Amino acid sequence: MKILKFCMLLSLPTAMACGGNTPKEVLTVRVDNEFTSLYMPDSCGVTSADGTISILLDDGSSLFMTGDCFVGNVVDGKRKPGEKMINNSLVHIGSDYRYLGSHYVGTPADPSSLCTPPEAATSSCAYWYWPGHGFQHGDILYCFMTKFYQGGEGQWGFVFDGTDIVQIDLKDYSVKSTEEIYDGKCPIHWGHCVMKADSYYYIYGTRYGTRTGAEYDPAPLYVSRTKFDETSGNLGAYEYFDGRGWSSDPAAAAACGGLDISVSEQFSVFKYDDTYILLTQRRAQQAGDIYSFISDTPAGPWRNKRLLYITPEQNADPDLFTYNAMAHPQFINKEQELLICYNVNSYDLQKPFMDVNTYRPVFLRVPMDMILK
C-alpha cells in the first residue's frame, strides 16, 4: 500500500540485563500488512471505511462496525468518481483470519446503511448513525449507535443528537428494534466502548471537550455498568462511576482518574488476565500519537502511560489526518502482539477516490510487553 512506505517504528530503549551485558530484546510496533489487506479488499465487500470497531462473537469470529464506507470495486487503487457512500456496515472476519463478507442494505450497485435512525423518515434534516460499540447476546447483536444530523453547513456541520441501542438479528442482519437511551442533551457520548467483565457490561464514553486551537480540553473518560435483563431482553438499569463508587444518578458520573491526555471519541478498554487496558489516540487536530494505559479496575485510576506509535500520514501529506485508534485483543497472536488499528482520512474529499488508501484503516502489531511493563 502506498501509505505504508511512510510507517515508522517506535522502539523501547535497549536495556542491559542485570548482572551482564546481554541486551534485552528491543520491542517494536510493526504494520500488519496481511490483516490490512484482508480487512479491506478491492471487491466483493466494503472497500473503504473508517470506524473499524470489532465485536467478538460467540463462535470466535468478529464483526467490525464501520462508519462512512464505500462498497464499490477498486481498480488500480482508485474508485469511480461520485460513488455512493453509506454511513455504517459490518465486516465479518473469522478467527482463522478469513474474510467472511460484509453486511449492509441493498446491493453493491445501490447500497444503503445497515441501520438508520427513525428520525431519518420524518425530519427535514439528514439523519444517520455512526457506530459506537456492541456485544452479542444469543442471536442478537446489540449495537450502541451515535445519532447525528446535518445541522450546519459544509462537511463538518454534523450535530450529535443522542445514543440509541439497535438490535440486529444475526440470522439475517435485519434490524429488530431501536431504542433511544440518551438524547442529544447528554454531555457524554456513551457506548463507544463495551467491555464485559464478570457479570457486568461496562459502558464507556467521553465528554466532548471544548476545542481550543488544535486541542480539545478536556475529553475525559467515563464509565457506567449494567447487567443484562433476560426478562426484557435488553440491558437493565445503569450505574455510573462517581469517583468513589457507583451511583444510579447519571448526573453523578465522574471522570476516571490518571489520564493526562484527551481521550479520542472512539477508543478501546479490554481486560487482559487481571489487568485492564485502555488504548486511545490523543484527541487533537493532526495528532497521530497512540497511547496505552493500564489499571487494576474497570474505572481506573489509569497508570503506566506508554506512547506506542505515531502515525506518519499527517506528516507526509497535510491533506491527511488519522484518528480513533482501536484495539482488537481477540487477535493477539502467538508472539503476544496485540492487533490495533487507526483510521486514515483526507480533508480533500476527492483524494479517497483517486487513492483508496487515503480512506482505509491501517493495522499494527504491538508487543503486549510494551503496554504492560
Where are the predicted features?
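Beta-propeller and closely related beta-sheet repeat lectin domains
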Residues: 50-53, 111-119, 123-135, 190-194, ...
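Beta-rich carbohydrate-recognition and catalytic domains
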Residues: 21-45, 57-127, 136-185, 202-262, ...
